[in-house]
Regions:
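Soluble "head" domains of membrane/secretory-pathway proteins
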Residues: 4-130
Length: 130
């Protein structure tokens, strides 16, 4: 789990987002967002309102890193992600500002600074990210 003030190393040169990647998103007027790529261009995404299960292209998404129910927020689906965009969510689904909210929405891949690959601060949490 990443926390506010954590310091990260990014892979950014020639980076193309992939499902499950933890990415840093430039927001220009605000602090960057650090979220996980859930769906990409061409994918169909649905969140079951009763079970809170995330369905990607009709299949339940395996998310061992999520420990809270995925609440809907402003999300109304199913949606098909347009090419050149990604849908991102935080791992703390009950308290994450992410693509489920109209305020954030879909992320243009051009706004992704890179993939977070390694945490260098705080010292007691140094290590690779999954």
């Amino acid at each position: 789990t990443l926390m506010h003030k954590d310091r990260l190393i990014l892979a950014s040169a020639f980076y193309t987002p992939k499902h499950g990647d933890i990415v840093v998103i430039n927001r220009y007027a605000e602090e960057p967002l650090i979220k996980r790529v859930i769906a990409m261009g061409g994918d169909e995404l649905q969140i079951d309102p009763d079970t809170h299960i995330v369905l990607l292209n009709g299949e339940e998404l395996d998310e061992p890193y999520v420990h809270y129910d995925t609440v809907l927020e402003d999300f109304r689906g199913p949606i098909t992600i347009p090419e050149g965009y990604v849908f991102v969510m935080g791992d703390h689904r009950n308290a994450s500002k992410d693509s489920r909210m109209d305020e954030v929405g879909l992320i243009n891949v051009k706004d992704i600074a890179g993939k977070a690959i390694f945490r260098i601060w705080p010292l007691n949490k140094i290590g690779g990210l999954e």
